[in-house]
Amino acid sequence: RTDKHIIEQICEHYKIENPDLRCEMYFSEDERRLSEQLSSQLEEDFIVIEPHSKDNYTPNRAYPFANWQKLVDKLGKNIQVVQVGLSNSPVLDHVVDFRGKTSFRSATLLIEKARLLMSTEGGLVHAATAVDTTSLVVITGYQTVKMVAYPQNINVYIGSHGPCGLKIPCLDCKRDSAKHNYEEIHEKVVDFLT
């Protein structure tokens, strides 16, 4: 179904009407203490980026790594950019490299302290809603905005088709991502940060 947000769809099954479109996570004092140690290495103002889309389910949510790099090159002149993710994923230039230094939960606590998370639709975007941090989310034609976008986020829909819902590579999703002008994202981030 693509007519409602996924949270609304799940709540509908349990007869819960008008749920808040946000997730909930709860953290221990130890988790918060470790997060403080990690974030103490950073400037007061920073943004978090996860440029890699988990592709073992579908490759069709990905946004070009080169475009993420262009964004970091421009944004990094005015604000610190911290990259999270798996230790074996490619690292962007000009970022604070926290790949492999955080779990999903500790990355969420780092995002809590950030001004913004930049990513494609995925787990960290959902987690950011639990800690009240706005995300800039790139959404491809793989899925509909209505199903995955949170109203508190900056949602950039780049699809010209769909939702395809394909788990195999979609040529339309790939083409849309390749031709998207990253400047649209840059302008939205600058507007948000100023």
Write out the residue ranges for each language-model feature:
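Catalytic machinery of carbohydrate-active enzymes
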Residues: 1-194
